[in-house]
A protein has these predicted regions:
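Alpha-helical scaffolding within the catalytic cores
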Residues: 118-131, 327-339, 368-376, 439
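Conserved SGNH/GDSL esterase-like catalytic core that processes O-acyl groups on lipids
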Residues: 141, 151-253, 271-368, 457-458
Length: 490
């Protein structure tokens, strides 16, 4: 009985202990849940308010790139046109320059603008040479200078093919003795050995008084060689050529040998001179190997070529990271000697990728630096037309993380146009020909892709596209020149 009472007491005690919790538990959980919802709401409100506040913080950059601005309403916000920033040094942007003579231009085509001076230094010389291509005792030559935009024969390879299909010709033209991109260039097989190579882009000492037209020089050891072989898989007209020339400078005698298509070596004994020299082999040349058999002193070698006897040839002179100002360091004597041995009919200057920026809007300094360089080229090559090609589209991300044309690009183009006008040469607006603002994004998104994801450089497909645009405007310019000339003779 006692045991029963004890159990009953414990049971009753348990009821007493449990009863308050049982009675008040629903009220406790309700208050707890209400507080939890309130705290969650307040925390969310605080986070959203913080994100809205962060939108009004100043722009922040990391390693030169603007970090994306926080904007919760970016998907529904009506976008406004943002005016290009002006820097404090900008005075007056050069006005658009009207060409001296305005030909009609096809709808949809961006034509070459002529700013010929009193000596007629526009495109006249080049168009005249093309008109006499079959009667000249040499090929019509184009020197195409540029930066990494044309590296490895991008653009120039396709332009060369188009011109050679229309006017004849073969071969890739001028090839420096050695190169760091031999495996990347698909228009020629290039091998070499036994050379001490020097380039304007070297971080160590470079003697600018010894350089050639491509901003290189090469010092051979005995037995040094360079081989070129035509390529038929990538483009036409470059699998064989008719003339291969070796360019060098030596004050003492030396002996060279050239082997064509793996055949017997043809020897050359060369005397010393204080000027540029060249020796050539002829024939149907699919491959050629030049070798230094003996040298009595330190000679400088520059390039070997694969050229036609007639027709057109395009020499690619690309320098990575260049703004074009390195051309001003080439000795005038060397330029004049190249004009004597390798006469050019058109000199193209395509730079700007390494000049345009977000921060700079006034490019007077660049225009003024390039003016004497253009004048030097006109003096050294008095019978060559000069064409300045404006910088192409270049995209980067703004503070909202959206791709846009770099603000400095369009400004720089205006200064490049002014450079052409002030030096009396021709100008082609590649930016507009590509499609203007956003065209680089379209080339990247194109199927197949025509540009790289840096939104700065084109690939070989993009090069073919732009080469086609330039080729068509060159042909149209030639047609208009011939019509104008015929009209003036009536």
């Amino acid at each position: 009985m006692r045991f029963v009472n004890t159990c009953a007491q414990k049971q009753a005690f348990g009821l007493v202990l449990l009863s308050p919790f049982t009675i008040f538990a629903p009220d406790f959980r309700g208050k707890f849940m209400k507080n939890k919802l309130l705290y969650t709401f307040l925390f969310t409100l605080l986070v959203v308010a913080g994100l809205f506040a962060m939108h009004f913080l100043p722009s922040v950059s990391f390693r030169g790139e603007p970090l994306r601005r926080v904007d919760l309403l970016s998907d529904i916000r009506i976008k406004k046109e943002i005016a290009e920033p002006m820097d404090s040094d900008t005075l007056v942007l050069p006005p658009p320059v009207k060409p001296a003579f305005v030909d009609t231009c096809k709808s949809g085509m961006v034509c070459i603008e002529e700013y010929a001076d009193s000596a007629g230094r526009g495109m006249e010389y080049f168009y005249e040479a093309l008109g006499k291509v079959s009667s000249l005792d040499r090929p019509v030559r184009i020197a195409y200078f540029g930066d990494s935009f044309i590296e490895a024969d991008i653009l120039t390879g396709d332009l060369r093919e188009m011109l050679q299909k229309r006017f004849g010709g073969c071969g890739v033209g001028y090839v420096p003795i050695t190169t760091k991109i031999a495996g990347f260039r698909p228009t020629v097989h290039h091998s070499f050995g036994g050379w001490s190579s020097h380039s304007i882009t070297d971080s160590t000492y470079f003697d600018r008084f010894r350089q050639d037209i491509s901003n290189h020089y090469f010092i051979p050891s005995s037995g040094a060689y360079v081989s070129l072989k035509g390529e038929k898989r990538f483009l036409s007209h470059i699998d064989t050529c008719e003339v291969s020339t070796c360019y060098f400078l030596t004050s003492d005698s030396l002996r060279l040998a050239a082997s064509v298509n793996g055949g017997e070596a043809q020897p050359f004994s060369v005397g010393g001179k204080e000027e540029l020299q060249s020796v050539s082999v002829n024939g149907r040349i699919g491959s050629v190997r030049w070798k230094v058999e003996q040298l009595d002193s330190t000679a400088l070698f520059y390039a070997v070529t694969m050229d036609p006897r007639q027709g057109v040839v395009v020499d690619n002179f690309s320098t990575r990271g260049s703004s074009g100002q390195q051309l001003g360091n080439i000795p005038m004597s060397i330029l004049r000697q190249y004009n004597r041995l390798r006469t050019y009919d058109l000199i193209v200057l395509q730079y700007g990728l390494n000049v345009a920026s977000d921060e700079v809007m006034n490019y007077t300094y660049y225009k003024d630096a390039m003016k004497p360089i253009v004048e030097r080229l006109k003096t050294a090559f008095p019978e060559a037309s000069v064409l300045i090609v404006g910088v192409g589209d270049r995209e980067n991300k703004d503070e909202n993380g959206e791709l846009r044309t770099m603000p400095g690009v369009k400004r720089l183009i205006r200064y490049q146009q002014a450079l052409a006008a002030e030096t009396g040469v021709a100008f082609w607006n590649m930016f507009e020909a590509m499609g203007g603002e956003g065209s680089m994004v379209e080339m990247v998104n194109h199927k197949p892709q025509m540009a790289n994801y840096d939104y700065t450089h084109i690939n070989f497909r993009g090069g073919k596209h732009i080469a086609g645009l330039l080729f068509e405007t060159l042909m149209y310019g030639k047609e208009q020149y011939e019509k104008r000339k015929a009209y003036e003779m009536e």
